[in-house]
Amino acid sequence: MPRSVKKGPIVASHLLAKIEKQKNLKNKKVIQTWSRSSTITPIFVGHKIAVYNGREHIPVYITENMVGHKLGEFSPTRTYRGHNKKDKKMQKK
């Protein structure tokens, strides 16, 4: 269920403060965060944020298309290794 418009988006205050510091800098550093539930706002566009997936920080470059989504959507937590392929013995039966 989406969040009410009158409440506004959820953004971690520490993450917002780090982005405000780097807003006018020419060389922007990667910002590490554990806040996967923060909503991407237009202020984030052009920054590179490393989002924690439970094992490592995955760097995500924020574009205009990502505004309104959550940071956690862009750092998958599970690795898909594919289904087992059937043996040739099983195919003959």
From Swiss-Prot:
Compositional bias (Basic residues): 80-93
Q: Which GO terms describe its biological process?
A: ribosomal small subunit assembly; translation
Function, as annotated, reads: Protein S19 forms a complex with S13 that binds strongly to the 16S ribosomal RNA.
Record-annotated membrane-spanning stretches: none
One term of GO molecular function: structural constituent of ribosome
Q: Where do the segments described as Disordered lie?
A: 72-93
Name listed for the protein in its UniProt record: Small ribosomal subunit protein uS19
Q: InterPro entries per the record?
A: Ribosomal_uS19, Ribosomal_uS19_bac-type, Ribosomal_uS19_CS, Ribosomal_uS19_SF
State the GO CC annotations. cytoplasm; small ribosomal subunit
Q: Does the keyword S-adenosyl-L-methionine apply?
A: no
Pfam families cross-referenced by the UniProt entry: Ribosomal_S19 (PF00203)
Which family does the similarity line name? Answer: Belongs to the universal ribosomal protein uS19 family.
Q: Which UniProt keywords apply?
A: Ribonucleoprotein, Ribosomal protein, RNA-binding, rRNA-binding
